[in-house]
């Protein structure tokens, strides 16, 4: 099958040009002017539009069981939503397995979840929920099989202590894998939460107050120092929500330490006032939403290059689940927001169309750097001969208001309801196949492929 995309502006992280793009058998074959492919072929007119590499979202949680509830998006509805939002690859953070389970256990479970459902290509981050000799021995074997990143938690049920973190950092570094971490100070959060609950203060606002930014920033600083102690091990901070943590990361980067960081649209565009609304429980996530000042600091990091990736942390629980389980108590509410369908459009509208970032920087944040960090480059995150024909076409002339009834996930609400975006996703192609076009999903379950990722190689700092 041949697909010729004509008259668009093709954008990569290192530049843009008005040119045609030819995809053949799912692979980009040629870029240039006046391409005349062999018949037959499909022609797509992208006049006035940007032609970007398909999005790479390296932080989703599909079909995750958090003990009190299972998220309502599985690998079909979640990847369907991703496709309709211009994302053609996801790397899912696997949930915790049974106490004492092997690393491989969750990989086998999650491959089963995704195999016949995923619409787009996918991989997984390993999850390390305890440390022993068997787990440490499994890491290099898992890395050789294409899992080149693993996640540690400093909070929640399976948090690791500093000694365990050091052991994990060392072994992951030796194995060619990147350590990712959810950084929050669990003890400080538990103390604050207990104070509020004892005082009967259980409204959504107290979720944010129980997890102040210092809890996150302290854990970021601690992880940076532990990574240095562990032999300058590479480190990736997930879902950054505040400027103090970013300051610590800037300092580490200035000292040439191999650290990278992602943030998410919710931390750029939503703020803590959401907790004071009638439906504030729908905004419970961790880290919580911060104030507008912290938003501004994150936007500075987006603009000046201090932040490397924009992902989503898509983790969907319905309002019915939230209200039934929490009964008005923030501490009992399952955490997470939907957003995998909105990431590309929100960042394009609030970043590119406002002049905060260039189209090239948009590519770097949404596809190129995620692909480079997580062993998918140049197959993903790039439009060049030999790369996968993963494409999102965005029309900057169109204005759209986000409405949940038009979205494709399995949630019963959107945190972005009513947001007006300048720029619309008009078509998504995965390996040359159109899977979304002009508001209609055209893909099918099970067409996504599991991606064996290459060992971690640090991009130039």
Swiss-Prot record:
This is D-phenylhydantoinase. Binds 2 divalent metal cations per subunit. GO terms for biological process: pyrimidine nucleobase catabolic process. The modification N6-carboxylysine is found at residue 151. It is an enzyme of class 3 (hydrolase). InterPro entries: Amidohydro-rel, D_phenylhydantoinase, Hydantoinase/dihydroPyrase, Metal-dep_hydrolase_composite, Metal_Hydrolase, Metallo-dep_Hydrolases_sf. Belongs to the metallo-dependent hydrolases superfamily. Hydantoinase/dihydropyrimidinase family. Carboxylation allows a single lysine to coordinate two divalent metal cations. Pfam families: Amidohydro_1. It catalyses: D-5-phenylhydantoin + H2O = N-carbamoyl-D-phenylglycine + H(+). A divalent metal cation 2 binds at residues 151, 182, 239. Homotetramer. Substrate binds at residues 156, 286, 335. The gene is hyuA. Catalyzes the stereospecific hydrolysis of the cyclic amide bond of D-hydantoin derivatives with an aromatic side chains at the 5'-position. Has no activity on dihydropyrimidines. The physiological function is unknown. One of its GO terms (molecular function) is metal ion binding.
């Amino acid at each position: 099958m041949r697909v010729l995309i004509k008259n668009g502006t093709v954008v990569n992280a290192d530049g843009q040009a008005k040119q045609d793009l030819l995809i053949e058998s799912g692979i980009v074959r040629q870029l240039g002017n006046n391409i005349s492919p062999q018949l037959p072929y499909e022609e797509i007119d992208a006049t006035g539009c940007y032609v970007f590499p398909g999005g790479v979202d390296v932080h989703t949680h599909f079909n995750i069981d958090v003990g009190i509830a299972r998220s309502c998006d599985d690998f079909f509805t979640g990847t369907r939503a991703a496709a309709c939002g211009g994302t053609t690859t996801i790397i899912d953070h696997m949930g915790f397995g049974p106490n004492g389970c092997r690393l491989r256990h969750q990989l086998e479970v999650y491959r089963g979840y995704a195999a016949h459902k995923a619409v787009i290509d996918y991989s997984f981050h390993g999850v390390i929920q305890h440390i022993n000799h068997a787990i440490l021995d499994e890491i290099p074997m898992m890395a050789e099989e294409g899992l080149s990143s693993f996640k540690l938690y400093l909070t929640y049920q399976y948090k690791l202590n500093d000694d365990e973190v050091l052991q994990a950092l060392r072994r992951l570094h030796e194995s060619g894998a990147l350590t990712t971490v959810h950084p929050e100070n669990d003890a400080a959060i538990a103390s604050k939460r207990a104070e509020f609950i004892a005082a009967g203060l259980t409204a959504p606002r107290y979720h944010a107050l129980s997890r102040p930014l210092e809890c996150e920033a302290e854990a970021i600083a601690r992880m940076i120092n532990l990574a240095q102690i562990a032999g300058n091990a590479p480190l990736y901070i997930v879902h950054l929500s505040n400027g103090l943590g970013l300051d610590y990361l800037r300092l580490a980067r200035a000292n040439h330490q191999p650290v990278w960081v992602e943030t998410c649209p919710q931390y750029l565009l939503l703020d803590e006032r959401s907790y004071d609304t009638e439906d504030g429980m729908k905004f419970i996530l961790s880290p919580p939403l911060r104030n507008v000042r912290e938003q501004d600091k994150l936007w500075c990091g987006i603009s000046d290059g201090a932040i490397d990736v924009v992902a989503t942390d898509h983790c969907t629980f319905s309002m019915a689940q939230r209200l039934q389980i929490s009964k008005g108590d923030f501490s009992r509410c399952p955490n997470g927001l939907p957003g995998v369908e909105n990431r590309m459009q929100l960042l394009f509208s609030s970043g590119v169309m406002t002049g905060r970032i260039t189209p090239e920087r948009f590519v770097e944040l949404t596809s190129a750097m995620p692909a480079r960090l997580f062993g998918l480059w140049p197959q993903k995150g790039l439009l060049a001969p030999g790369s996968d024909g993963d494409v999102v076409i965005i029309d900057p002339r169109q204005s759209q208001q986000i409405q949940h009834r038009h979205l494709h996930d399995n949630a019963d609400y959107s945190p972005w309801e009513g947001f007006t975006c300048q720029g619309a996703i008009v078509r998504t192609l995965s390996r040359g196949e159109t899977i979304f076009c002009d508001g209609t999903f055209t893909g099918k379950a099970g067409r996504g492929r599991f991606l064996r990722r290459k060992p971690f190689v640090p991009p130039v700092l």
